[in-house]
């Protein structure tokens, strides 16, 4: 296989990678794709970290030049690549963030702690935004628990389509709240590890509405699959 995969999380720390590749000559779009598991420690594979705004490099570009995968490492059948990738992406966008919600709660608790210390909590606007963040996090958890309970009602299935849009925008807004609570400390390097954590959270949260499907893609999914609206015109790949 030859080609490139971009924005691969933690590829520089991984032994294996999954790849969606074209397996049928002349096929276009979502047709003719295969879902492969490939070892990274082989000739023909190069990994290049992508520097992020916060200074880290969690994402990577992976280049393949004649790399190989075993036939036993095909997931599903040749031609099913798109279907398998969408099922995996649906999990990433949805209930896989249940564990992430614990980190969200820690970040919110940290914001409240600092707001009480530096007086930001005296602002009615800050208190309102904290309350909004708290209720939003609870709503996320309850929806995720409903999905986990195997509730197959049409209402729950439609609401599940909103989950990625909901949590990613919520977390981005939490980063903005954190910076407003920190006030001037948001703009400088601090010895307080709490400030550094919130600064890093603010920077990384900017990507939440992009990876796993942008806001625009999520709104299309909600409109077309959840509300039954006409599909947006699409070009051919």
Question: Regions from the language model: what does each represent?
Answer:
Residues 104, 130, 160-163, 198:
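Hydrophobic packing residues in well-ordered alpha-helices of helical domains and bundles
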Residues 6-12, 53-54, 207-214:
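Glycine-rich phosphate/pyrophosphate-binding beta-alpha loops
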Residues 1-3, 19, 36, 64, ...:
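Buried hydrophobic positions in well-ordered alpha/beta secondary-structure cores of metabolic enzymes
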Residues 2-48:
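A short core secondary-structure module
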Residues 116, 120-127, 138-191:
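C-terminal helix-coil-helix/basic helical segment that borders enzyme active sites and/or dimer interfaces
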Residues 22-25, 39, 43, 65, ...:
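Short, well-ordered loop/turn and helix-capping segments at boundaries between secondary-structure elements
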Residues 84-93, 97, 182-237:
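Glycine-rich phosphate/cofactor-binding loops in nucleotide/flavin-utilizing enzymes
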Residues 45-141, 208:
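Glycine-rich beta->alpha junctions and the first turn(s) of the following alpha-helix
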